[in-house]
Amino acid sequence: MNRKYRKTVIAGNWKMNKTPSETKEFMTAFKAILPKGRWCDVALCVPAVCIPTAVRAMRETRVGIGAENMNANASGAYTGEISADMLTDAGCKYVIIGHSERREMYGETDADVNAKVLTALNAGLTPIMCCGETLEQREAGVTMEHIAMQIKMGLRGVSEDKIRKVVIAYEPIWAIGTGRTATPEQAQEVCEGIRAVVRKLYSSKNARAISVLYGGSMNEKNAYDLLAQPDIDGGLIGGASLVPEKFVKIIEAANQPTE
């Protein structure tokens, strides 16, 4: 895809899948079929116990490893939690923040997301901040109203000089893990709206520069049509990122020029 002002990012989200041993097997197969030459930015966000294995395996490549969540606090009595500094020291470049599954299952709020975004940026991580609407919100016609509020709250306190480090992922909740996918036109409409929100909060220059991903059941079959849209700069990939061949096909789709 041709992106004059911004990066194309293909990010995998493994969720709670794969052991360290399975991660090693995946990385071996993945490296063997990675496209040659220049290609888009690629991230693999893996379970915490798999991060060291993934970092070691991808050290000689341009693939960045990321985490699926983090705690906003620097340290302390937070049993079971992982800090941003722990992630950077382990070799992470990215971290997913505010995924709908975290919001729904664990009660994460926009304020929680905001605290994590600020902490991630200060630690040198690239936050992939998620936003999206339920089917009920879409049918009620309040999709952009809801998403605009998520973005405004999530980016509160993020300075002009750091906003371009943030990646925003639009994930229609009704399309995650359901096999349903927003049409390219539906996804484009929302991603364009997200860029408009960033323009209001910051500037046209920053809105042009920020990467907006689509994260609702993108796969190797629909990737090209979604990525051909002018305001969709990549994908946050779930199930398809667990299979090396499928993930590589999405990367290849992102590298194809559009008409």
Label the model's feature ranges:
Residues 1-259:
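Active-site loop-to-helix "anion-binding N-cap" substructures in soluble metabolic enzymes
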